């Protein structure tokens, strides 16, 4: 029997300029998820964990990420009314990461099966395996639909560690897909060469991972980035978009476990998110590695919230 690790959502509060549709902000649109929530709505799911980060020898603090993201989203203005629910937060306690990932997968799958759009608020990048489990279990995934994972990240996260961590999720996913005899395309945009060993590049080649280095993702490289994303989208039917905030420059995203010495400009990341949201293929999204303990002026949380805002408000639903 699946253990229930879901805790209720916190209250959403923020600035109030009025109650008409012309004054709406996120906190006025979000309500707790209930059984009658309509298909097509966005459902926020928190994943409070930094167990995977610690196992990967990183800095603790990402467990506070979900509520920091909620806080940054709260007062963002909505151009038009939004259907959005908060399912609460899957909390990883007592080092029980694997149980938390399974619980998250169950919530994501239920959300997808209800015809809704899950957006998972991490948490370390160990969130990815839980998000994937949900998509893999959901009815929306059929044998004829190929899953594509687009990871915006400075790291491959393909480590072969003895226990699951924030550095292993995509290797776990690829191994599970291989064992099941199913096809999955894993692509990464923003890879930092100095942050990934030759062994990790070799592993990526072995799994036929497509990637674009951070050196090739500047604002002047827009065409190269557009081609990379377009080719990815053309080869898949369902997209899981995962954003590790350490893909951004440290000046923009200081509040992560491993701040980037170089990073991909926010303009490029926003462009990619917009393209994926408008593709009509985006099934699920998560945001990982926000560490409020190291954030400065909430820069990282605000940047992440802007990306979430654009993804949710610009997303074209998947055709049934």
Curated annotation (Swiss-Prot):
InterPro entries: HutG, Ureohydrolase, Ureohydrolase_dom_sf, Ureohydrolase_Mn_BS. It comes from Rhodococcus jostii (strain RHA1). Mn(2+) 2 binds at residues 153, 155, 244, 246. Mn(2+) 1 binds at residues 125, 153, 157, 244. It catalyses: N-formimidoyl-L-glutamate + H2O = formamide + L-glutamate. It is an enzyme of class 3 (hydrolase). This is Formimidoylglutamase. Catalyzes the conversion of N-formimidoyl-L-glutamate to L-glutamate and formamide. Its cofactor is Mn(2+).
């Amino acid at each position: 029997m699946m253990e229930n690790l879901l805790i209720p959502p916190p209250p959403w509060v923020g600035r109030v300029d009025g109650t008409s549709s012309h004054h709406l902000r996120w906190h006025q649109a979000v309500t707790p998820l209930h059984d009658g929530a309509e298909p097509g709505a966005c459902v926020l799911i928190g994943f409070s964990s930094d167990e995977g980060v610690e196992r990967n020898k990183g800095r603790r603090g990402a467990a506070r990420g979900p509520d920091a993201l909620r806080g940054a989203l709260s007062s963002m203005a909505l151009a038009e009314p939004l259907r959005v629910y908060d399912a609460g937060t899957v909390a990883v306690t007592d080092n029980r990461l694997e149980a938390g990932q399974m619980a998250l997968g169950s919530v994501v799958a239920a959300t997808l099966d209800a015809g809704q759009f899950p957006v998972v608020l991490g948490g370390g990048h160990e969130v990815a395996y839980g998000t994937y489990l949900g998509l893999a279990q959901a009815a929306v995934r059929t044998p004829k639909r190929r899953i594509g994972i687009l990871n915006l990240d400075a790291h491959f996260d393909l480590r072969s560690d003895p226990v699951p961590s924030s550095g292993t999720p995509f290797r776990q996913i690829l191994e599970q897909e291989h064992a099941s005899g199913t096809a999955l395309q894993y692509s990464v945009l923003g890879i930092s060469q100095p942050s990934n060993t030759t062994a990790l590049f070799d592993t990526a080649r072995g799994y036929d991972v497509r990637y674009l280095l951070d050196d090739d993702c500047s604002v002047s490289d827009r065409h190269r980035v557009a081609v990379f994303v377009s080719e990815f989208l053309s080869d898949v039917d369902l997209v899981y978009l995962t954003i590790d905030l350490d893909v951004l420059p440290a000046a923009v995203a200081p509040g992560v476990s491993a701040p980037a010495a170089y990073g991909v400009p926010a303009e490029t990341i926003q462009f990619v998110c917009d393209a994926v949201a408008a593709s009509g293929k985006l099934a699920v999204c998560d945001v990982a590695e926000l560490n409020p303990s190291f954030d400065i002026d909430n820069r990282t949380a605000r940047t992440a919230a802007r990306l979430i805002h654009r993804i949710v408000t610009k997303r074209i639903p998947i055709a049934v």
